[in-house]
């Protein structure tokens, strides 16, 4: 395995930084970490200083699979829910990539620039609406557990500075106080 000999670290948010709470070396493509948790929390698996994937620390046996094509976490209810969402988002990301390729093909095929612009813009807007709906619905369905705030923070961290997009405003406006008062969301 290309990961053999690498150290993996589990880190959780602590104030404004990520705190390492466990680590393991990958041997023959496998690693194992065990522990007892008194609460459910979002975490990230790191290789060196690079976050490679989010997951939920919760009671149960968590299985993490990393290969060249994808990363999947299963075995517990919230991780199953999170990676179902990740799979749907990846599918939309793939469609967005394919849309860019389609635009290039249309140019190469000699289609009229205004026709290309119209068609590609329509498809981009449709895809953006699907992505926003997916994120909003997922966060709303998970207001009451760590996934709602966790994915909300990931959505916000896509921007180089704090910004209130219409999507972020909608999520906040419709959220219960418990979500709004979460320390991660308040920041």
Task: Set out the residue ranges of the language-model regions.
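A non-transmembrane, solvent-exposed segment enriched in polar/low-complexity residues
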Residues: 1-133
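A short, acidic, amphipathic alpha-helical segment used as a generic capping/interface helix at domain edges
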Residues: 133-139
């Amino acid at each position: 395995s290309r990961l053999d000999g690498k150290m993996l670290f589990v880190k959780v948010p602590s104030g404004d930084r990520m705190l390492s709470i466990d680590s393991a070396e990958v041997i023959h493509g496998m690693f194992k970490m065990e522990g007892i948790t008194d609460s459910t929390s979002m975490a990230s698996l790191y290789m060196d200083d690079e976050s490679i994937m989010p997951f939920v620390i919760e009671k149960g046996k968590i299985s993490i699979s990393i290969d060249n094509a994808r990363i999947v976490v299963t075995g517990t209810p919230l991780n199953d829910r999170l990676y179902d969402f990740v799979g749907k988002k990846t599918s939309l990301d793939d469609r967005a990539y394919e849309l860019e390729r389609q635009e290039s093909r249309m140019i190469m095929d000699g289609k009229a620039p205004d026709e290309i612009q119209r068609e590609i813009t329509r498809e981009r807007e449709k895809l953006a609406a699907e992505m926003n709906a997916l994120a909003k619905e997922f966060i709303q369905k998970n207001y009451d557990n760590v996934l709602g705030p966790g994915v909300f923070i990931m959505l916000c961290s896509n921007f180089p500075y704090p910004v209130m997009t219409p999507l972020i405003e909608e999520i906040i406006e419709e959220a219960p106080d418990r979500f709004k008062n979460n320390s991660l969301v308040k920041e």
